[in-house]
């Protein structure tokens, strides 16, 4: 439209000035119709100045130049003697931009696209651009299957040549796939092929991936899936001949027809390697080895190319070119592969840089690097550095880029870009519980103290049954070789009776230190010494507790309370294997920890204690939003030298860190008291059972969890929130328990059985909040026993095992 007016104006001017074809000298330029655009700005855009000799061509160029500014809807140039009169009609200015009816596309995204096209408040309205935007948005809706969608721009005039721009959306409904037909398939049925598609004409209730809503991008992906399916099974001549997508008259249904030619299956006969192998021909030969009579497989060919690139990358050849051309023999249905390799230059690392570590010091990140500056570039070492940074748990994301150094042929810089997360946990709370009464809790845990990598924690708890304080410090790099040093001091005043456990009070304090030794990238060992003083009092006569006191030579009366104190020195040992992909919210890998401690000479007690914890993450889909999580914990402890393990070292289960849905520490053996009349048992029985948990010297806990995408959470917070469905199982038992005629007479259960397994199932939500990790769970016990306590909703601050 604008060009049409330009042409008309030029013709009119030309016809009006035939007599002046030789030109004339401009003595003045006068504008008519300017409102928003200043005269000076308009003059700057004109190729004609006062004093110039102007021809018809100059006038035409002037009109084009003014139209090109985008400020005018119409431009006319007239002559009055030696004065140029420029008549313009300005485009209206956009006063506001609003949207209506858009549900699939957010306002912010629309504004970004409009601004990218030059449509923003304060700018001139270009109707041609608006029409293009309308069409582009409608094309977007068509691509996601909404064929009845429409987008209309409503322009409302305002005073002073301004307008309101409103985009009105009518999105309609997504067209659903009525039928998918594949024509030309003989070796495989339609159901076999379509079952691998994302788009489906039928979606079972359990299929969370399949979708009947048509999307152009998904169809393209499904066609590629179909192609790969055949190529991976030897059909080297497979071809998708055509694809038809038909729309029903009401635009609500889609019929898809895919015409294919399967061809025959082809076998591999040979692999021929050509090019610059950089002296690694033996390794290339190993990577390109094929089995006699093996079917052609497109995915294996791609994997072979990737393996060759990875191998060359280990030796510094960062940008190798590897391509494979299949030589197909239709006569005998065979394929010969020609692999062309160009290793290129060997690259060396000039610098390793870090970005985004505003808190963490460079040295904390640099010590995790396995790629060295000045050495040749090793892709495996660069990736190891990324994995180790992720495993620290200091960062939400870690990305790595390798950039060539300008002006050099063989140097690169490696840049690690991190996004730091809050590595500190601060909590302070006041609460009230039926067991704990008024409760105060405060704590600070910082896993990256002042950016040094030190882990420092101080915590305290005060309620009706416990007063606890602890200070801990760990230096993960006590030596440059990665030997860690950690220490802890604590004080605990614990009244077990008020915590609904077996009746006793224990005032304990202690100190321990630990050295950690890295063995390799994934394995480490720990050793340390510890001291603890346990001051036991108010011990009520209970079978398992008295059994321990008897083994210590105290032989207390079964009708009296008892007191005892013990000082123990322990040798602590541990081993950890860890190849998790990151320190928090992992998606793949395993972490297994074995810990043990044993008392050493000078201790009052003689016992050992072992625990094994293992966690395994298995991603289900490529983007790792669906992950299977398996967890297990085993524990066993026993006395030495004829003594029993102290009962206060027993294992417990139940609660948010073991078997969810059960009360904390309530699973397993219960206290059986002597002299029952004194402790509320009926009928004057000398022994009776209670609901007080006493724990046991053996424990087994397992969990299976399905981690799913969190609904209703934006992508911005996806890395901070995790949702899962779980099933937990666990048991605690006492291998030293012996049922006697007396315990059987009074119906005391056999607590030596490991088969009394509790089971629960539920849903959990974890949130890496600014205050630290928060864990919410709701679980329902499926299998429980007498004396167990249910606790369906549970909340926890801090990491769980």
Swiss-Prot record:
The keyword Membrane applies. One of its GO terms (cellular component) is Bam protein complex. It is found in: Cell outer membrane. Keywords: Cell outer membrane, Membrane, Repeat, Signal, Transmembrane, Transmembrane beta strand. PANTHER family: OUTER MEMBRANE PROTEIN ASSEMBLY FACTOR BAMA (PTHR12815:SF23), SORTING AND ASSEMBLY MACHINERY SAMM50 PROTEIN FAMILY MEMBER (PTHR12815). Belongs to the BamA family. This is Outer membrane protein assembly factor BamA. It comes from Serratia proteamaculans (strain 568). The gene is bamA.
